[in-house]
């Protein structure tokens, strides 16, 4: 009697079914992981700008000069030290009023970020008293840890 070589059709079908089940579970989890990491990357891009804004305001630079992502004639990106396209996932916009209140926003670009984040934004809000809060339009499970307010 000859020894069997190779695999039977049923064995191959079972392996294909197992791989299909694993892929059905793994791919959505991977997409969630990507969306969460994009949120963390966006927050890491804009968080250091809080220090830049505070330092500029403390040196007496008018808030209307601390702008990026705008065509305002008073805007001077040298105060911010970052380009609006500093992160390939989207754009950064800084708008601070002369009163000191304003926002630092990261807008996720469609086609550049994952579909779960496309068109959404993370915003750092500053009050005139210098209190910063963070808000996001992302789904709650994708909001980065440093931005706790939904």
UniProtKB/Swiss-Prot annotation:
Compartments, record wording: Fimbrium
Quaternary structure? The pili are polar flexible filaments of about 5.4 nanometers diameter and 2.5 micrometers average length; they consist of only a single polypeptide chain arranged in a helical configuration of five subunits per turn in the assembled pilus.
Primary localization: other
This chain's protein is named Fimbrial protein
Q: Which Gene3D superfamilies match?
A: Glycoprotein, Type 4 Pilin
- Residues with PTM N-methylphenylalanine: 7
A Gene Ontology cellular component where this protein is annotated is: type IV pilus
The gene from which this protein is expressed is pilA
The UniProt keyword set, sorted, is:
Disulfide bond, Fimbrium, Methylation
PANTHER family on file: GENERAL SECRETION PATHWAY PROTEIN G, PREPILIN PEPTIDASE-DEPENDENT PROTEIN D
**PROSITE patterns, per database record:** PROKAR_NTER_METHYL
**Which positions does the propeptide occupy?**
1-6
Please state which protein family the record places this protein in: Belongs to the N-Me-Phe pilin family.
Task: Show the disulfide pairing.
Answer: 134-147
Q: Which domain of life is it from?
A: Bacteria
Mind telling me which InterPro entries this protein's record contains? N_methyl_site, Pilin, Pilin-like, T4P/T2SS_Core
Tell me yes or no: is NAD among this UniProt entry's keywords.
no
Which species is this record about?
A: Pseudomonas aeruginosa
Q: Name one GO biological process term.
A: cell adhesion
């Amino acid at each position: 009697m000859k020894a069997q070589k190779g695999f039977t059709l049923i064995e191959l079908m079972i392996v294909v079914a197992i791989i299909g089940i694993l892929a059905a579970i793994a791919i959505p989890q991977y997409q969630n992981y990507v969306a969460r990491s994009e949120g963390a990357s966006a927050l890491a891009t804009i968080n250091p700008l809080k220090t830049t804004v505070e330092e500029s305001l403390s040196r007496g630079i008018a808030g209307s000069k601390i702008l990026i992502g705008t065509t305002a004639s008073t805007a001077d990106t040298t105060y911010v030290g970052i380009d609006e396209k500093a992160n390939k996932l989207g754009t950064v916009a800084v708008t601070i009023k002369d009163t000191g209140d304003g926002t630092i926003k990261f807008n996720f670009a469609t086609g550049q970020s994952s579909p779960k984040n496309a068109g959404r934004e993370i915003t750092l809000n500053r009050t005139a008293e210098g209190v910063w809060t963070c808000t996001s339009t992302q789904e709650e499970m994708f909001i980065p840890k440093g931005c706790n307010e939904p």
